[in-house]
Design a protein with these regions (language model features):
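Outer-membrane pore/translocation modules
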Residues: 1, 8-10, 32-132, 181-214
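Membrane-spanning beta-strand positions in outer-membrane beta-barrel proteins
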Residues: 26, 55-57, 104, 142, ...
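Transmembrane beta-strand segments of outer-membrane beta-barrel domains in Gram-negative
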Residues: 122-141, 152-156
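One face of beta-strands
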Residues: 16, 27-29, 40-42, 141, ...
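A generic beta-sheet turn/junction motif
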Residues: 20-24, 134-138, 169-173
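Transmembrane beta-strand segments of Gram-negative outer membrane beta-barrel proteins
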Residues: 1, 20-22, 27, 60, ...
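Outer-membrane beta-barrel initiation region
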Residues: 1-22
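Outer membrane beta-barrel transmembrane domains
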Residues: 68, 140-181, 189-191, 201-203, ...
Length: 214
């Protein structure tokens, strides 16, 4: 599933997420491939945490991105599939407020600009969301719940309202977790979106810290 939950590759995919940073600035690349080896998208986020103390939090970010899509072309009277590259530039703003130790409310806004002639020129993506940090199921198994979020999506002259929820099951001291995202349209006239989209993911997380010496 993509950053905007209404869209999906439609088949199994492999995702690589990395975060490299110091203090408030981080570089967060997100690389996606289909399991047949074809690239799906490369997103190169730069993020800055403006406010990190107190109840109110704020981060901003920007990225260049490359999306790949397969299109048929005619070569020497033969139809072949080729990979077309679409380039995008985007920026994000994400304020949130901590209601309690394990619960927060926030919103998220993303603006994207397509650079190709046949790509979506402008994208507006706005969400209102909440997060419950941990629900203890057993001694070392926890469920993280993102309560249903509402979001508005506008792609050029098409738009719609959607709802979305995320569940993540984790085990203490285990690098593997299982996550599922469910997305349902409320009212939409976006031709490329689907009425209902869901996925299930197996996640592997590693935490490696490096110290700069000298």
């Amino acid at each position: 599933m993509s950053l905007i939950p209404s869209f999906t590759l439609g088949k199994p995919a492999l995702l690589f997420e990395l975060s490299i940073g110091k203090n408030k600035l981080s570089f967060d690349p997100l690389i996606r491939f289909a399991l047949d080896g074809k690239p799906w998208s490369f997103v190169f986020w730069w993020r800055y945490k403006v406010l990190t103390e107190g109840k109110f939090r704020l981060h901003v970010g920007a990225h260049p991105a490359i999306n790949f899509r397969t299109i048929p072309v005619s070569i020497n009277n033969e139809t072949r599939d080729i990979q077309q590259v679409c380039r995008y530039l985007a920026t994000e703003v994400a304020p949130s407020i901590m209601i309690s130790k394990n619960f927060s409310l926030g919103m998220y806004y993303l603006y994207s600009r397509g650079l190709e002639e046949d790509a979506t020129k402008t994208t507006h993506f706005v969400t209102v969301n909440g997060s419950i940090s941990q629900i203890k199921i057993t001694k070392d198994v926890f469920l993280k719940v993102a309560p249903p979020q509402l979001f508005y999506l506008m792609l050029d002259n098409e738009d719609g309202f959607f709802s979305n929820a995320t569940l993540t099951l984790t085990k203490q001291n285990c690098p593997f977790s299982v996550s599922s995202v469910l997305n349902k349209s409320i009212t939409a006239n976006i031709s490329s979106s689907k009425s209902f989209v869901w996925n299930i993911s197996l996640l592997y997380s590693f935490n490696q810290k490096y110290l700069r010496r000298g």
